[in-house]
């Protein structure tokens, strides 16, 4: 559909560095990103996609220390200064590999059940980690185009991948994870909520 293949994004000699990541409180992190229109990505668009893929894949292959960057499992476009609706996710959850490059992702339905990651979440754009449980939906239904599988997805996610997707789409909607922490009782958890993690 788009004028670039995922494999073309991998052929990159880019060397990630900490300056790639826009940090809180940079205003771009509080701007709602724009949908990518049409199917012709510009050279600048492709460059940003390459940066996103390169940064996270370096982390996936345990090379973050080599480049002196903070390790992460996913990244949103505005974290590298690109005000467009895209996110790259690459991590293993037990025996399953989660690998998506989502264009124009939108959450169209959320479960009423609540989940949270234990002990909490972190973010490449937030150096001052905020302690507390980040309140998320247990399941989310997402529509997007996945550049890796080259197809539209219209599916429900649960577990840690659902937490990750909500974190990244939160970025695209001008949010940061700590917006969803109970400021009065950061580690409050209702017994009905699902704890994900140890």
From Swiss-Prot:
Its cofactor is Fe(2+). PANTHER family: PEPTIDE DEFORMYLASE. Its EC number is 3.5.1.88. Belongs to the polypeptide deformylase family. GO terms for molecular function: metal ion binding; peptide deformylase activity. Removes the formyl group from the N-terminal Met of newly synthesized proteins. Requires at least a dipeptide for an efficient rate of reaction. N-terminal L-methionine is a prerequisite for activity but the enzyme has broad specificity at other positions. This is Peptide deformylase. Binds 1 Fe(2+) ion. It comes from Ureaplasma parvum serovar 3 (strain ATCC 700970).
């Amino acid at each position: 559909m788009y004028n670039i293949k995922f494999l073309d994004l991998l052929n990159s000699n880019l060397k990630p560095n900490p300056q790639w990541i826009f940090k809180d409180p940079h205003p771009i992190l509080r701007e709602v990103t724009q949908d990518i229109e049409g199917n012709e990505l510009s050279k600048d668009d492709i460059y940003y996609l390459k940066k996103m893929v390169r940064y996270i894949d370096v982390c996936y292959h345990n090379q973050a220390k080599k480049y002196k960057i903070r390790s992460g499992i996913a990244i949103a476009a505005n974290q590298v200064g690109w005000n467009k609706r895209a996110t790259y996710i690459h991590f293993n959850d037990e025996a399953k590999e989660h690998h998506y490059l989502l264009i124009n992702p939108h959450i169209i339905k959320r479960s009423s059940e609540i989940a949270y990651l234990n002990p909490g979440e972190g973010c490449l754009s937030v150096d001052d980690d905020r302690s507390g449980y980040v309140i998320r939906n247990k399941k989310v239904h997402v529509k997007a185009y996945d550049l890796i599988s080259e197809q539209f997805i219209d599916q429900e996610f649960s577990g840690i991948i659902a937490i990750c997707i909500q974190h990244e789409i939160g970025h695209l909607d001008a949010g940061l994870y700590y917006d969803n922490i109970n400021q009065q009782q950061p580690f409050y958890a209702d017994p009905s909520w699902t704890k994900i993690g140890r």
